[in-house]
From Swiss-Prot:
Start-end of Polar residues biased regions: 1079-1092
Originating organism: Aspergillus clavatus (strain ATCC 1007 / CBS 513.65 / DSM 816 / NCTC 3887 / NRRL 1 / QM 1276 / 107)
Pfam families for this protein: TIMELESS
Lineage: Eukaryota, Fungi, Dikarya, Ascomycota, Pezizomycotina
Biased composition (Acidic residues): 580-596, 911-921, 1105-1116, 1148-1157
Protein name according to UniProt: Topoisomerase 1-associated factor 1
Transmembrane regions listed in the UniProt entry: none
Family membership: Belongs to the timeless family.
Biased composition (Basic and acidic residues): 896-905, 981-991, 1001-1015, 1025-1034, 1117-1128
Amino acid sequence: MDDEGAPLSESAQVVDPDVRAHVYSLVTALGGFNGENADRYVLGDDALACLRDIKRWLKLHDEKNNRMDVARCLGEANLVNGDLLPILTLWSTSGQNSKFMSRIALACLELLVPLTWPLELHSEMTVNHHRHTPYLQQAQVLYKRGILGPGGSSLLRTIIRIGLPSMAVPRSDRTTRDEGILKLMLYLLRNIAVISPHSRLSAEGDEEETSRSATINAFQDQDAFALLLTMCSNVADDFNLQDVVLLEILFHIVKGVNVEKLFMNDTQRKAKRTEELGDLLQKESSLRREYAKNAPTRHGRFGTMIWVKRDDAKVSTVSGQDVLKDSQTTLYKMDQSKKWNKPQVRRRQTEVTVNNDFNTPVNLNSTATKNLRIFIEEFLDSGFNPLFTHVRKAIEREADRIMDINSRHYFYTVAWFLEAERVRRKYQRERHSQEDKSLKKMEPDSFALVASVLNQETFVFLNRSMQKSFDNKEVEDLTAEMRCFTQILLTVQEMAQSPLDDDQEVADNIQNRIFYEETTHDRIISIIRGYKDQGFGYLDACTQLAHVFLRMLEHYSKENVDMQIRSRRRIKRKAKQDDQAIDVEDEEHASEDEELMEAERVSKERKFDFKRFAAKFCNQKCVDTFVAFIKYYKELNTDQLKRAHRYFYRIAFKQEMSVLLFRLDIINLFYRMIKGPGALDSSKPIFKEWEELVRQILRRMIKKIDQRPALITELLFSKINSTVFYLEFGFEKQTISVSKRPPAELEVDPREAKTTDEKLSIVVRVMIKDEHINLVKWISEVLRLAADERESWESREQQPGEPTAPNPMIPVKPDDEACQKAMFSNAKLRLLMTLIGFERLGMEDVPGASWVVPSSFTSDDLRHTKRVIDQCLIEPATEDPDQDLSRLIRRKYANDARGGGRDEQNLDIDFGSDSEGEDNVPDGPLFPPNHRSKANALDQLKKQRQKRRKEDGDRETPDDEVLEERRRARLENALARQAKIKSDLYIHASDEESDEEADEEFFRLEEQRRKEQAARIKHALLHGVVEEISDKSSKKTGRKRQSDQHTTLNIDAHTKRQRRKNRTDKLDEGDDLVMAGTEAQSPDSPGLGSSSHDAKGIENTPLTSDEDELEFDDDLAFSRDRNRRKDFTPNVDKMVIEPAQQDADPAAPDEDDDEDAPVVGSSRRRVRGGFVIESDSE
């Protein structure tokens, strides 16, 4: 092998001799023209094996080693034109019925595709690639020349015939071999369309035979266009894997073709060419006139050199006879002799894709124009929608066959065909008008032929691709996408003018969708502002897009006054911590509550203002983009000149921002466009518009210089917003600074620090750790000065006879501006001042707010606080690795749920709780069920008694059926009594009135009942005997249950609501005879209404009337005291069980009680934590 690093000399071998010998031997063995008939190609004995060996050499040597040696040898051996093409001709004429010859033809096709594969210059090329690429490019041009078939050969038709059998097979029945044959056929057509004579290489006189016109004519004559139409129209059904190759073929056929010339007839095309020739002659005459002004005379054969004396007494040397004309010419030539070594900017290395360049125009002859127009019209009618729908879906799902370049092919081809559809409609209307046919009689065509690229899916794909290309600075892709977007807008604009209602409705819907997103507006503005030497194609595309978008949006906003757009902006959301509240420099030790400010996009609709949107184009970057575009004014056509004219007119007169154009280079450019040298052609209509525009701009500039002499200096520079405002209005723009929000309020965790001194120590040590020791020292100094001032005031106040002023508040004065800013922005400093007791004056928390030491602080208080702070400054904090002091400082919430506390305003309001064990419900429920607190306590005692009896064997526990029957009877009885409750018991008109006599009567009865009960309990404890309640009193009490009900209701009606609550609660707790809790006892029959108070009486606690407001849970009281007092209260059970026996069976309340008779406790359900607990032991 040759050394790639060695320089190429005469002795250097381009290709390894062994490789060349093997390849030449295979080509020789393939066959040749030797024989009786010199015009007939004769195959060798092992022709098929030779073709396969050559393919194997290409694959294993060139592709595997990334070289081009075998391809170079095959080109030198003339394999394509000398062997492969004759073999294909032989097969097409006589060997189509031979299976062997069909295999030979397919093998030839397999070699033609890699040998004609387009060559691109890229960054990964090796020395071997650079050595062989120029030769292979010339060889490929010769391959194309031979395939296109000069002299009437039909090799393209022959190649298509190879793939026809595979096309005829249904897609479901095709094998991998069939798909491969179709791919080979299409790739060869693609290669033929791509290959073109290289501009840097010698053409050898075959430009016309390999030009775009020759390719189009060959495709038309040899049925390649018919093949493409068939496959495009059926791409979704039969050729779904060939969509990308079809797109590439279309791209390389139509790229660079002028659509306007394509649809012209011969007369129009001839007139257009004549006009172009006239323009060229006019430019030549203009150049000659400019040259004649400074042309040398007949005496100019001698050299000329002069000295130019400048103002600073220096002399410069200028040569040439043209400097003798005048001093201005002399100075101009001297300026031209100066050279500016402009610094080279390191740009991003971009791939050179010559074959995919669509900005270079291509000229077609008349025959090729006619053939291409026929194909384009048929493709628009049948294949446009299926192909582009299928390709877009494949690109969106990133199919394996998709490459990065295919997205560019897609957008450019869509743009080209949309423009072709609009131009075709335009010339159709012109032809109908020339044929004296009314436009009304002509049936309008619908835009459904191109509907596949006018749907929402395409718009989403286009916007996403534009944003991606703009972000990644992919210039060529973005150029194709801008062209596509522009043509979509122009197509929609024409749809809006269609006579068909459906087209108008669809156009309005599309415009609404496009203009609704503000991100689309912002993207276009960013593209215009972001131009920087991306090339003329990019410049042309972005200026056209801005021009069309701005005009259509202006028109649409005028028709839709209430137009709404969706605006997306970034807002900052603070989750749990404020950036200004806590210093998060050390993220490892940050509190769990700290979170960084995160940004999210929110969408909201707002009314669209076109003036506001158009003003975004009024900046120096947009102006510079159009100025860079207009610098090519000599090469621009009328539409492009009009585009730039409309923009500058909008800037100067519609937006009243002509100051942006007052720059020397811009003014000089405008002047040269009108006055020369190299001015616009004055015979063109656009010249007059530009002339008037430039005149008005210069007039405004001169007038503005008279008003603002500072503009003379500003002519040298670009204008920023503040400069533009000053030059327009004569004064600086007044800006109002928006005040910042105060940081979040902090607090020290009260669980870690109880006293104020501890909290102060924590805050001070955290500030010292955060390197804010200067602020701590400043606070200490403020406290010292305040203590001295307060001490002097206190000493004056103690002197007798001297009137003293009231205790004044002492202002907290910051040392410098940084300290003043920290008083607002430093959350820990604000926490420290708050803990000390400093107060902020005023209601607004804004920067610069005043803080004062309140008058309530004494000098001793201030000195004590200062000592605490100074102690923290003197003694360094002990580093505890397990505890970070900064974690003890947290954000203070308005309603801190972590502490379980309530608002300070609601501390005195008891809302009650549903938690277990709490029966304190404000005002009680509206219709409460029977209270079970007393009964539950009795049940507990009964169960204990039953347990003792069971242990003694006195009695067995009743079965479950008896217990269930008794429980059901009790429940029915309780529900019946509850249903009798009337609302008058709880709500009465007299509740808002006061009755002192009723109050005194109520308290007297309560006091009497409490004393009697306390006396009975004391007697029972002292003597061990329970005072029995006779049958008479029991029956009497039973009778009073009915007779005293009316009295109880009257008493309740004359009391206040809160007092009624206390009384009824105590009656419910104490009266075991009234199960429903709605009847009061009379003084003659005291019950157990104050059992909880009696429990206190057991411990000899004196009872007062104030204890009447206390509320006890009887269950809680009994369970708490029962076990503790079991030893010294043996007869308590008798006292409690007697009335409980009456309540054991509510169905028979009048039955006489027998103390000695066995008693069965009622089976009551136990409730624990809201759950009913059933026990089998009951």
